Amino acid sequence: MSVTVETPLQAGPLLKEKKQELIDIKNIQEHARTVQPFKASKHQPLISGSVSKEAAIATHAALHIDLTPEKEKKIREMYDRLDADNDGSIDIRDLTQALSSQTPHIPATMAPKLLAKMKREDSDRVTYADFTNYVIAHEARLAEVFDQIDSNRDGEVDVSEIKSYCKEMGVNLDDHKALSIVKKMDQSGSSSVNLNEFQDFMLLYPSTDMREMVDFWRHNLIIDIGEDGQVPEDFTPQELQSGVWWRHLVAGGVAGAMSRTCTAPFDRIKVYLQVNSTKTNKLGVVSCVHLLHAEGGLKSFWRGNGINVIKIAPESAMKFMSYDQIKRWIQEYKGGAELTTYERLFAGSSAGAISQTAIYPMEVMKTRLALRRTGQLDRGMIHFAHKMYDKEGIRCFYKGYLPNLLGIIPYAGIDLTVYETLKSCYTQYYTEHTEPGVLALLACGTCSSTCGQLASYPLALVRTRLQARAISPKNSSQPDTMIGQFKHILQNEGFTGLYRGITPNFMKVIPAVSISYVVYEKVRKQLGATMS
């Protein structure tokens, strides 16, 4: 193999041939390791002025002879945007920051994999030459993928072609989901995607494996933040057969256990305020902390956390199995058609109701244990449950069941509806032909979740009071029905009485979500569950 070079080289971003000389390819590789580019932040050409023959050879090898001025300018500008600290190279911090702020459709957790694709093996940084090589090679592979998706060879990929391609990969999408993917890639508003749009959108996704790309579209471009807590994850038949599903359930279980344990003090304070705070005693968060610490010390803030963690496994398994079966029934009723967003919401809410019914006795025990005093658990949880049964019978394990069940649907429905409405309004007024960024989606998700909690919290409070009624002297004379509790609270404490304890409930949201996300990602990777 040989290349054509010049001696000397004129200033400029491209190489103009004056004198031809054939150089063996092994010499090119030798020289390419020694040539350092200028800083891209200055928008200077890689080679400027008269340089040696070796530098010209290395430059040709790195930039490819057929690179046009327009293409080089585009690559330079892209490189400059990624080089956040303007030090002339790209490292892991630059990529993480860029993925977070510039490409919200690609998770920042992909930065290490992307860096490995771009850099040389003997370096932990990406030079301009490395980046150019990556862009050209990656775009070439993306062009091959685009050709496979573009079944009618018209140079455009539309909704039907996305659906067909995903189906070949074992993923069935309805029109709504396929349109969501196309809209995120489409820059012109044409409801289809050309090659340049496809390459621009997928350029920083560090893989061209067809199966991985379809997984990326399905899990990152469709599932909305507002649904995450309400509708269980969907798994394809291939993922069910390969065992991916259980790895994600295990990762989710470990993440949930860590999150609940770290935020258990917030949960105990909330439960205590729900049951004991009134208009007359004016018990607040700070005074509650002092009271609980004085009664049982620091360890007392984790009362009830053990059973709260234990119930994760049966609840998750029951919800997953129920959700999968309900989806199948709905699909059979519809003749095999894909589920809509609200059909998934119905299936998820129904699965949640079934799983809650199965593990509800553990919910009651969690509340009782969170409210217990020092010394009331001297012989373990089983003995504690046996004492409850002896004193109150089997019905005590389902106290507050009705408000708990009724609280599932309004929370899920309001959360999803508000989220979709806010996202639609944002897209209509603040963006053109593109989806909102990460910060906008997080804001929509936070608002929708808050609305869902505000709507369902009175039911949660009544549920907790009914669960705790037998062991709380203050509540011994209170009604033992849901409607009776609502009347009692409104008559004696007013409307604000329905929101006792909501402050610590909101306080735990950010740390709970953050811890859960970090632990989930770590465990998922350790188990080898690759989901982009």
UniProtKB/Swiss-Prot annotation:
Keywords: Calcium, Membrane, Metal-binding, Mitochondrion, Mitochondrion inner membrane, Repeat, Transmembrane, Transmembrane helix, Transport
InterPro entries (UniProt xref): EF-hand-dom_pair, EF_Hand_1_Ca_BS, EF_hand_dom, Mit_carrier, Mitochondrial_sb/sol_carrier, Mt_carrier_dom_sf
GO biological process, one term: ADP transport
Binding, Ca(2+) 1: 83, 85, 87, 89, 94
Subcellular location: Mitochondrion inner membrane
Cited PROSITE patterns: EF_HAND_1 (PS00018), EF_HAND_2 (PS50222), SOLCAR (PS50920)
Start and stop residues of the Solcar repeats: 243-329, 339-425, 436-526
Domain EF-hand: 70-105, 107-136, 137-172, 173-208
Membrane topology recorded in Swiss-Prot or TrEMBL: Multi-pass membrane protein
Top-level taxon of origin: Eukaryota
Transmembrane segments: 249-266, 304-323, 349-362, 400-419, 442-459, 501-518
Family of the protein in this entry: Belongs to the mitochondrial carrier (TC 2.A.29) family.
Function in brief: Calcium-dependent mitochondrial solute carrier.
Name the record gives this protein: Probable calcium-binding mitochondrial carrier CBG00135
Organism: Caenorhabditis briggsae
